């Protein structure tokens, strides 16, 4: 029989082994006690285990308490997996899983959740706890338990997500407390924590399709930040491609408005083609024919240049705006198109006045075989005065014009852009005061300078010139009767150009009067109609002016036909078989506006200085 001391020593060793076994099994999350709470083999009573566990782990940190804390954590994780998704609802006829987010954006919270779900919040808080609460030195059993728990959680929901990388993704990204995750599918996350998050232009993007949305920003169905979901009550966001709103198609579908667009397009093509060809022909005739370089023809070529500029530059921009309700060059075209148009009106006004003065001088010198004695410098000086005066008088239009955008009420459509008269308050004081003065006097200045001055002055000068021509015709001899007829013909041409100009400028003045005095009683559609009519009449004037010159002025029509038929042998043979009387009339007609020549000049001399085409 053994001694009692040996029995006590054996019992002490058994208790020590049981204590070590309880500690190891608690660290692994396994309870050693059985259902009847009795000790098996080398185990001890549950009360001893509970007491030893409390002594080993500290108050409230026994193995059973840790197991109790783990159960709600798993329930929270399951609830997070079964939570509602934030995807867009599927469009009709598309994949039903393509978008459940609009439903979530309408029913769900407009902003981010206040805090991530339970497990993530607990991990983030654990990373911020001081190290002394978990023990010092070697890793404690609680740390081992957390590591094993995280490894067990790796599965369909958290495969490849380690506790360390997940903790870093929350701790190292600035403003991590404001970041949240939007699941794309139920049970699938929208983020990856294998690699550090990379910043994109619109937010923080993870890797392998994981994306972190910014506060108040929901992800699209494809998980990209480029296409933002419009949240209720917030502004619409999107990438640069989505910001490019669709332009209006004026030709489809076929409606009453599309028929009007086709009519506008066809009319503009006719005006563009006729105006470009006619004005280029006038400029080429004057530049390539030495005998046509008189002061009057130079003025007409200058007028043709500005008409060409109006048609070539302004007409496409105006038509584009009329069809799409958008200015092609935006603010630049809004300012430069009115400026060129008003400058063209000034050039036309001053050119008509200069032509009237030139015709009056020609009529008073008919009996002396009127010849142009002005040199090139004198002609250049007159053209420079016309240009500088017209450009300076039109300069306030650049200051007054501002681009305004109006919403059409159609989703996805570009807002309508209008070029309105509005003075910017950012201008310097001097320019601002001048702009206000010009704006208050613009109506009467426009009417007086660009309508009354050319029409009244031209009509008055034409009447005086016609009277001089009649007096010269009564006292003339048969030798210069043809010259007098040509002067009368040219005077009628100037009057016809003035009538055409006055007719085309009337709608612009009517539009200005309506805008100044009757703007409240007239609808916007009526104002738009008046504007487009005045624009088209201005282009029509620029298109018809060369046609009128070719019809009423024989030197221009003959030179145009020679330029068109200079390569045709039939036209050359036909021109060589004319009668001597016709040759004399043509010779007199061509010399009517020729520089540095008289009627007595020989045909050979004339032929040597003339160049065709």
UniProtKB/Swiss-Prot annotation:
Subcellular location: Cell projection, Dendrite; Synapse; Cell membrane; Endoplasmic reticulum membrane
Disulfide-bonded cysteines: 334-419
Keyword set includes Membrane: yes
Annotated transmembrane regions: 266-286, 300-320, 336-356, 380-400, 444-464, 494-514, 532-552
Residues exposed to the Extracellular side: 27-265, 321-335, 401-443, 515-531
Comp. bias (Pro residues): 109-119
Entry's Gene Ontology molecular function annotations: G protein-coupled peptide receptor activity; G protein-coupled receptor activity; heat shock protein binding; Hsp70 protein binding; neuropeptide binding; neuropeptide receptor activity; PDZ domain binding; peptide binding
Keyword Oxidoreductase part of the UniProt annotation: no
UniProt region (Disordered), positions on chain: 80-138, 152-172
Keyword annotations: Cell membrane, Cell projection, Disulfide bond, Endoplasmic reticulum, G-protein coupled receptor, Glycoprotein, Membrane, Receptor, Signal, Synapse, Transducer, Transmembrane, Transmembrane helix, Ubl conjugation
Tissue expression pattern: Expressed in brain and spinal cord, and at lower levels in testis, placenta and liver, but no detectable expression observed in any other tissue. When overexpressed in cells, tends to become insoluble and unfolded. Accumulation of the unfolded protein may lead to dopaminergic neuronal death in juvenile Parkinson disease (PDJ).
Xref: PANTHER family: PROSAPOSIN RECEPTOR GPR37 (PTHR46216:SF3), PROSAPOSIN RECEPTOR GPR37 FAMILY MEMBER (PTHR46216)
Function: G-protein-coupled receptor that plays a role in several physiological pathways such as resolution of inflammatory pain and oligodendrocyte differentiation. Acts as a receptor for several ligands including prosaposin, osteocalcin or neuroprotectin D1. Ligand binding induces endocytosis, followed by an ERK phosphorylation cascade. Acts as a receptor for osteocalcin (OCN) to regulate oligodendrocyte differentiation and central nervous system myelination.
Name of the protein: Prosaposin receptor GPR37
Organism: Homo sapiens
Gene of this entry: GPR37
């Amino acid at each position: 029989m053994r001694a009692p001391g040996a029995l006590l020593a054996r019992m002490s060793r058994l208790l020590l082994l049981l204590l070590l076994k309880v500690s190891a099994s608690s660290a692994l999350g396994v309870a050693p006690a059985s259902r009847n709470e009795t000790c098996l083999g080398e185990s001890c009573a549950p009360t001893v285990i509970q007491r030893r566990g409390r002594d080993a782990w500290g108050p409230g940190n026994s193995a059973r308490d840790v197991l109790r804390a783990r159960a709600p954590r798993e329930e929270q994780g399951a609830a997070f997996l079964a939570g509602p998704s934030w995807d867009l609802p599927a469009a009709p006829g598309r994949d039903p899983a393509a978008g459940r987010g609009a439903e979530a954006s309408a029913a769900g919270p407009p902003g981010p959740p206040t805090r991530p779900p339970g497990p993530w919040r607990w991990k983030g808080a654990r990373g911020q706890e001081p190290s002394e609460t978990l023990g010092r030195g070697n890793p404690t059993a609680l740390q081992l338990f957390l590591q094993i728990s995280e490894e067990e959680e790796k599965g369909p929901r958290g495969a490849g997500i380690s506790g360390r990388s997940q903790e870093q993704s929350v701790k190292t990204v600035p403003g991590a407390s404001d970041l949240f995750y939007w699941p794309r599918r139920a049970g699938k996350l929208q983020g990856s924590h294998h690699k550090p998050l990379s910043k994109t232009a619109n937010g923080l993007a993870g890797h392998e399709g994981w994306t972190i949305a910014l506060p108040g920003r929901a992800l699209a169905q494809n998980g990209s930040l480029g296409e933002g979901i419009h949240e209720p009550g917030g502004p619409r966001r999107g990438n640069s491609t989505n910001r490019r709103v669709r332009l209006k198609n004026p030709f489809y579908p076929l409606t009453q408005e599309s028929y009007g667009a086709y009519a506008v397009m066809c009319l503009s093509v006719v005006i563009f083609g006729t105006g470009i060809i006619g004005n280029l022909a006038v400029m080429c005739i004057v530049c390539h024919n030495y005998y046509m370089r008189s002061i009057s023809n130079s003025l007409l070529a200058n007028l043709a240049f500005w008409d060409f500029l109006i048609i070539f530059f302004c007409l496409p921009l105006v038509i584009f705006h009329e069809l799409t309700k958008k200015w092609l060059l935006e603010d630049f075209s809004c300012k430069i198109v009115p400026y060129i148009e008003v400058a063209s009106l000034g050039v036309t006004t001053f050119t008509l006045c200069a032509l009237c003065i030139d015709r009056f001088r020609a009529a008073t010198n008919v009996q002396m075989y009127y010849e142009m004695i002005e040199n090139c410098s004198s002609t250049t000086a007159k053209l420079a005065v016309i240009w500088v005066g017209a450009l300076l008088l039109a300069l306030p239009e650049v200051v007054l014009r501002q681009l305004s955008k109006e919403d059409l009420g159609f989703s996805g459509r570009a807002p309508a852009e209008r070029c309105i008269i509005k003075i910017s308050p950012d201008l310097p004081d001097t320019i601002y005061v001048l702009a206000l003065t010009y704006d208050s006097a613009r109506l009467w200045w426009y009417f007086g300078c660009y309508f009354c001055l050319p029409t009244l002055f031209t009509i008055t000068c034409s009447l005086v010139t016609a009277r001089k021509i009649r007096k010269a015709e009564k006292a003339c001899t048969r030798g210069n009767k043809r010259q007098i007829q040509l002067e009368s013909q040219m005077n009628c041409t100037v009057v016809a150009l003035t009538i055409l100009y006055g007719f085309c400028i009337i709608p612009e003045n009517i539009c200005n009067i309506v805008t100044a005095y009757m703007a409240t009683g007239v609808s916007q559609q009526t104002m738009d109609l008046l504007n487009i009519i005045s624009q088209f009449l201005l282009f029509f004037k620029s298109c018809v002016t060369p046609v009128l010159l070719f019809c009423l002025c024989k030197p221009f029509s003959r030179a145009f036909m020679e330029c068109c038929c200079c390569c045709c042998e039939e036209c050359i043979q036909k021109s060589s078989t004319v009668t001597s009387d016709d040759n004399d009339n043509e010779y007199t007609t061509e010399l009517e506006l020729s520089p540095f020549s008289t009627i007595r000049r020989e045909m050979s001399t004339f032929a040597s200085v003339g160049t065709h085409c």
